[in-house]
């Protein structure tokens, strides 16, 4: 499904809906109204209906949403109804933390390879994965079915890491490095900066004082 015309904010909210719905399913909830789902997701009911309308019709009037079916439908809409092979470049503190984070695999993102250029890290085993030299990246992409690259290098090495990923045939990148990277337009990039959340919290605290 082509989603170029769907706002990024909608995609991010859909990810929240999946997280909340998965928790509800785990708690034994089978059906939920749009009002209750909206409260759980900290949005209004009309926003949920608008977001879901991009992908079709969901829910039953007077009943609500069937939790299991809605999870499956949203996952299919986002393309996460299958497992994505991921490669991580940069096995520092953040890289190690992500490798040990089991939630990625549970949500359909399997980190299958870890790469670094530091000779002292190459050969080390982290969370069951042997750290491999970045020069071997291209050879591992097809072998391991790698499609998404994760950059956790220092800022000054981010572009070099991106080059390895693109040259190896990676289709998309999640960049945790505090640096912008230059990649072809057909390779989507998501930048992750934890400080943005601190800014938001600081602003909300300040606005209430």
Swiss-Prot record:
GO BP, one annotated term: response to redox state
A Pfam cross-reference name: Put_DNA-bind_N
InterPro entries membership: CoA-bd, NAD(P)-bd_dom_sf, Rex_DNA-bd_C_dom, Tscrpt_rep_Rex, WH-like_DNA-bd_sf, WH_DNA-bd_sf
GO CC annotation terms, alphabetical: cytoplasm
GO molecular function list: DNA binding; DNA-binding transcription factor activity
DNA-binding region(s) from the entry: 16-55
Entries under SUPFAM superfamilies matching the protein: NAD(P)-binding Rossmann-fold domains, Winged helix' DNA-binding domain
Record keywords: Cytoplasm, DNA-binding, NAD, Repressor, Transcription, Transcription regulation
Subcellular compartments: Cytoplasm
Residues that coordinate or bind NAD(+): 90-95
Family to which this protein belongs: Belongs to the transcriptional regulatory Rex family.
Complex and partners: Homodimer.
Known role: Modulates transcription in response to changes in cellular NADH/NAD(+) redox state.
Name of this protein: Redox-sensing transcriptional repressor Rex
The species this protein was found in: Maridesulfovibrio salexigens (strain ATCC 14822 / DSM 2638 / NCIMB 8403 / VKM B-1763)
Species lineage: Bacteria, Pseudomonadati, Thermodesulfobacteriota, Desulfovibrionia, Desulfovibrionales
